[in-house]
C-alpha cells in the first residue's frame, strides 16, 4: 500500500518512481481516491524533474490500463491493426484518406479521433459535416465495421483511458500541459488502448504546430517513438511541415469535400499527397503489409487509381449512418455557406510566410470551431483555394476563397487572412513536406 503524498515527495526530491507507485497513483486518479491537489502536485514535479524512459512507459501503460483495452483476437482478422495520430494542424485532413487507403491495402484501422482543439481542426467535427454520420457507434458495431469495412473513425468513449481525462483536466488549469512525458502519456494511453500492432505519429513543425519549435517537436516525436515501442507497439514518427495550411482548404465541410476529391482523383493538393502517402507508407511497412517504401507506394497508388480507397471511404460513411451515395454525390449532402467570395492581397509579391495558427483561429472565429466545449459548429464555413508559400500574388490570384455566414463575418476573416499571409519581393526557399523520419 502506498501513500499518494509519499509518491509526490519522492518525485519532488528528484527520484524515479517504480512501476507499482505509478500504477497506484494512476488508479487513484481513475477511482477518485487521489485529490485534484495531489494530481496537480505530481504533474508539477514531473514538469520540473522530467521522467526516465521506464517511468514514461509505466505512466503510459498505467493510463492505458485504467480503462478498456480493445482486443481484436476473437475477430481473426487477416491483417494488422494499425493507426496514425497527428499532433494537429490546419487543413490536416489526412485521416480521411489515410484510413481508407490503408484499409484498401489490407490493414485494419480502428481510428479513435478527437474534436478541434484551439486553432487545430478536429477529425470528428469534419465527419459530422456529413448528414447522419455517427461518431459514437456502440462497441459491437465498431468491431463489426472494422471487420467488414476495414476502417472506422469514432470518438473517444468514457471507457478508454479514463484516468487521462481527469489528469489532463488538472494539467490544463495548472500550467503543466507542455511537459513531454505527460503529453506522451496522454497521447499514447488513448492510442494504445485501441489494441494496435503498429502506430505512426505525425508530429507537426512550424507556425501552425502544437509545439512551438522544431527542437521541441523533434523531442516529442522521439519520446513517443521510444515509449510506444517500449510498450510493445511498433511505432515510427514523421516530422511534417505546418508552416502553411496543409490542404487547399481549412474548415469542416470544405475539407471533407477535398478528401473525397483526393480519393477519387478529381483533385490532389501536392503537399497533402506527399504527407498522406508518407504516413500510409509507414503504416504499411510497420504493419508488415509492404517490405519497403517502393512496394508500399505501389500498393497505395494502385488503390487510389482503381477506386478501391474511395469505395472503402464510401462504405465507412454508409456503415456509420451517413448517405450510401456520399462519394458520388458529396455536393448534394455537404452544407454550403451563405457567402463565398475571394479575398485578394493589398500588394503584390511572393508569399514568404504564413501564420498558420492565425488562419486556424480565423476559421474558429467564423464559427468553424469551438472556443468552449458547449459551442455549436457551423460546418459550412472555412477557406478553399488557399494560396501556398512561394505563390506569386497579384490582382488575379486570390489569397483564398472565404466561405462565411454573412458579410460581417467575411470581412473579419478577410482581415485575418491578409494579416496572416506575408508577401515579399522574392520567392522563399521551399521547405520539405516531411522533414525527418524517426525510428527507435
UniProtKB/Swiss-Prot annotation:
Homodimer. Disulfide bonds: none annotated. The keyword Cell membrane does not apply. GO terms for molecular function: 1,4-alpha-oligoglucan phosphorylase activity; thymidine phosphorylase activity. The gene is deoA. GO terms for cellular component: cytosol. The keyword Glycosyltransferase applies. It holds the Pfam family PYNP_C. GO terms for biological process: pyrimidine nucleobase metabolic process; thymidine metabolic process. The enzymes which catalyze the reversible phosphorolysis of pyrimidine nucleosides are involved in the degradation of these compounds and in their utilization as carbon and energy sources, or in the rescue of pyrimidine bases for nucleotide synthesis. Pathway: Pyrimidine metabolism; dTMP biosynthesis via salvage pathway; dTMP from thymine: step 1/2. It catalyses: thymidine + phosphate = 2-deoxy-alpha-D-ribose 1-phosphate + thymine. Its EC number is 2.4.2.4. It comes from Salmonella choleraesuis (strain SC-B67). InterPro entries: Glycosyl_Trfase_fam3, Glycosyl_Trfase_fam3_N_dom, Glycosyl_Trfase_fam3_N_dom_sf, Nuc_phospho_transferase, PYNP-like_C_sf, PYNP_C, Pyrmidine_PPas_bac/euk, Pyrmidine_PPase_CS. Keywords: Glycosyltransferase, Transferase. Belongs to the thymidine/pyrimidine-nucleoside phosphorylase family. This is Thymidine phosphorylase.
Amino acid at each position: 500500500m502506498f501513500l499518494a503524498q509519499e509518491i509526490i515527495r519522492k518525485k519532488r526530491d528528484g527520484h524515479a518512481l517504480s512501476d507499482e507507485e505509478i500504477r497506484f497513483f494512476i488508479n487513484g486518479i481513475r477511482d477518485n481516491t487521489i485529490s485534484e491537489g495531489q494530481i496537480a502536485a505530481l504533474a508539477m514535479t514531473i514538469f520540473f524533474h522530467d521522467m526516465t524512459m521506464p517511468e514514461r512507459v509505466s505512466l503510459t501503460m498505467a493510463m492505458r490500463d485504467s480503462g478498456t483495452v480493445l482486443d481484436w483476437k476473437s475477430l481473426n482478422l487477416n491483417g494488422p491493426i494499425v493507426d496514425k495520430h497527428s499532433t494537429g494542424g490546419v487543413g490536416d485532413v489526412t485521416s480521411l484518406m489515410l484510413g481508407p487507403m490503408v484499409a484498401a491495402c489490407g490493414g485494419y484501422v480502428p481510428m479513435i479521433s478527437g474534436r478541434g482543439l484551439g486553432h487545430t481542426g478536429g477529425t470528428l467535427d469534419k465527419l459530422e459535416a456529413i448528414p447522419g454520420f455517427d461518431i459514437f457507434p456502440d462497441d459491437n458495431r465498431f468491431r463489426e465495421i472494422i471487420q467488414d469495412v476495414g476502417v472506422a473513425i469514432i470518438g473517444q468513449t468514457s471507457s478508454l483511458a479514463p484516468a487521462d481525462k481527469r489528469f489532463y483536466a488538472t494539467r490544463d488549469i495548472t500550467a503543466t500541459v507542455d511537459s513531454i512525458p505527460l503529453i506522451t502519456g496522454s497521447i499514447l494511453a488513448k492510442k494504445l488502448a485501441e489494441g494496435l500492432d503498429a502506430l505512426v505519429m505525425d508530429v507537426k513543425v512550424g507556425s501552425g504546430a502544437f509545439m512551438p519549435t522544431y527542437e521541441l517537436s523533434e523531442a516529442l516525436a522521439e519520446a513517443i517513438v521510444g515509449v510506444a515501442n517500449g510498450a510493445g507497439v511498433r511505432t515510427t514518427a514523421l516530422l511534417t511541415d505546418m508552416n502553411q495550411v496543409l490542404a487547399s482548404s481549412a474548415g469542416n465541410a470544405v475539407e471533407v469535400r477535398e478528401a473525397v476529391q483526393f480519393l477519387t482523383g478529381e483533385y490532389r493538393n501536392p503537399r497533402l499527397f506527399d504527407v498522406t502517402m508518407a504516413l500510409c507508407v509507414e503504416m504499411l511497412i510497420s504493419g508488415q503489409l509492404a517490405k519497403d517504401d517502393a512496394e508500399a507506394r505501389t500498393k497505395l497508388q494502385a488503390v487510389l487509381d482503381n477506386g478501391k480507397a474511395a469505395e472503402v471511404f464510401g462504405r465507412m460513411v454508409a456503415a456509420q449512418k451517413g448517405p450510401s451515395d456520399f462519394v458520388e454525390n458529396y455536393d448534394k449532402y455537404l452544407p454550403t455557406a451563405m457567402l463565398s467570395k475571394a479575398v485578394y492581397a493589398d500588394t503584390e509579391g511572393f508569399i514568404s510566410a504564413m501564420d498558420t495558427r492565425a488562419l486556424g483561429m480565423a476559421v474558429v472565429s467564423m464559427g468553424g470551431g469551438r472556443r468552449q466545449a458547449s459551442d455549436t459548429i457551423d460546418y459550412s464555413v472555412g477557406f478553399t483555394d488557399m494560396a501556398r508559400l512561394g505563390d506569386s500574388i497579384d490582382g488575379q490570384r486570390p489569397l483564398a476563397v472565404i466561405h462565411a455566414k454573412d458579410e460581417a463575418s467575411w470581412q473579419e476573416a478577410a482581415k485575418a487572412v491578409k494579416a496572416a499571409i506575408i508577401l515579399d519581393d522574392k520567392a522563399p526557399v521551399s521547405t520539405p513536406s516531411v522533414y525527418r523520419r524517426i525510428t527507435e
